[in-house]
Regions:
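A charged N-terminal "starter" segment
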Residues: 1-182
Length: 182
């Protein structure tokens, strides 16, 4: 074996991730390098993170997620404001991207809804909604959505029971399931 890069291939260095200051759109807003070059995310040096949770580890910056969620929620409310002749607009976090009860709480607290695609995602979102909105959230899921192919009658029934605000039915069969679920 050789460590040589084949002719015509880019050098491996070109595959390195750009620095936070060069491409801030690819990094959390809190990402920076220390004077000695260490990467810091959310106020924690990567070496500190790895000391607590060995690699591989997934790091989600709460301040960054909250800031982006608040920006999206505000933009949708402002740009689709009913006084502009629009019907209103809402921003929804895609639960399929990464969903825990805590992540769901953060985006709900910042004014977003949550788009779910399974009974599990819906259950996590309902639990988070109850933490954020209190006991009335057990029957008021208007800040949530449920879509996804092949929904079961049980999933649709849960959504209807909790008054999920956006139920996307993908077929006439799902319309029949919804009718039977009520």
């Amino acid at each position: 074996m050789t460590d040589q890069i084949p002719a015509g291939e880019p050098p491996l260095g070109s595959l390195a991730c750009p620095e936070p200051e060069d491409r801030p759109d690819l990094w959390p807003t809190t990402a920076r390098r220390t004077d000695d070059g260490e990467l810091v995310l959310g106020g924690l040096a990567v070496s500190e993170i790895l000391a607590e949770a060995p690699s591989p580890v997934f790091v989600l910056d709460e301040a960054d997620l909250r800031g982006r969620a608040a920006s999206w929620a505000a933009a949708m409310h402002e740009e689709f404001w009913p006084s502009y002749g629009m019907a209103g607009g809402e921003a929804f976090y895609a639960g399929k991207a990464f969903l825990t009860t805590k992540v769901a709480q953060w985006v709900l607290e910042e004014g977003m809804g949550i788009d779910t695609a399974s009974r599990g995602e819906l259950a996590v979102s309902l639990a988070a909604l109850q933490e954020v909105d209190g006991e009335e959230a057990t029957t008021d899921g208007t800040r949530l959505g449920l879509h996804g192919n092949g929904k079961t009658q049980a999933e649709i029934a849960v959504a209807l029971t909790h008054h999920v605000g956006h139920l996307v039915l993908d077929s006439l069969e799902e319309v029949d399931l919804a009718v039977r679920a009520v």
